[in-house]
Amino acid sequence: MALDKDIVGSIEFLEVVGLQGSTYLLKGPNGENVKLNQSEMNDDDELEVGEEYSFFIYPNRSGELFATQNMPDITKDKYDFAKVLKTDRDGARIDVGLPREVLVPWEDLPKVKSLWPQPGDHLLVTLRIDRENHMYGRLASESVVENMFTPVHDDNLKNEVIEAKPYRVLRIGSFLLSESGYKIFVHESERKAEPRLGESVQVRIIGHNDKGELNGSFLPLAHERLDDDGQVIFDLLVEYDGELPFWDKSSPEAIKEVFNMSKGSFKRAIGHLYKHKIINIETGKITLTKKGWSRIESKE
């Protein structure tokens, strides 16, 4: 029997009609034959034949219809962020909480391949079922985000740095959504490098519009921009994984050899970095802070 795409990708009540080995046989509302592996039950209780239970319905790669009681965060009626597992020539493969990965086709990803997501990034998606009942991930459109974001109508977030993920990347700017639901636009003039689709980035809030959408920047505040000595120290910290065995009590000779600056210049530079929470100064070492790491995107 052909799969009924009305139930694929959704949560439905199905009747248990039998048990074969470790597989329950279920019947859909239109007579669809659906299988349930016991590993996809949410507890150890046996299901009773003749009773109806709630399941999420999905096709496997061969087109067979399967059910699970482990409800995914994403359905064909619900958008959420899904983790990218890997990318290949077909697109990005994501984890939506099912026993199988789901493909976001390459045609839906940015034309510039360097802006494709990488493993560990998160895409804002829903599930899409095509005419052959294959299941794919569909990226959220601008109209979808407009109906789900949390508007902001005051300046309480101005100059705050928050984490967000791009759901749309264009030459004119980056469109991002935070976990709190804030919708943020970063104009191309407020960035030096374009973030990947789905990449977790730190963005500084610089204002909002009448619709409650936030404007952001990937650039530091003018007074936080580094002088030459500060940039030398910052670049070396990045090169050495965010930690250097130097501090304000290091010898002038060692500082001169590594940084090519006097101890006085070094102390002024790390003092500036510390004041703006770019580094931590600890006994015998300096380390990059989370805010410090967030500057990498803006300096590339």
Swiss-Prot record:
InterPro entries: CvfB_fam (IPR014464), CvfB_S1_2nd (IPR048588), CvfB_S1_3rd (IPR048587), CvfB_S1_st (IPR039566), CvfB_WH (IPR040764), NA-bd_OB-fold (IPR012340), WH-like_DNA-bd_sf (IPR036388)
Matches recorded under Pfam families: CvfB_1st, CvfB_2nd, CvfB_WH, S1_2
Transmembrane residue ranges: none
Keywords for this protein: Virulence
Similarity comment: family membership: Belongs to the CvfB family.
Function, as annotated: Contributes to the expression of virulence factors and to pathogenicity. Involved in the production of hemolysin, DNase, protease and protein A.
Protein name per Swiss-Prot or TrEMBL: Conserved virulence factor B
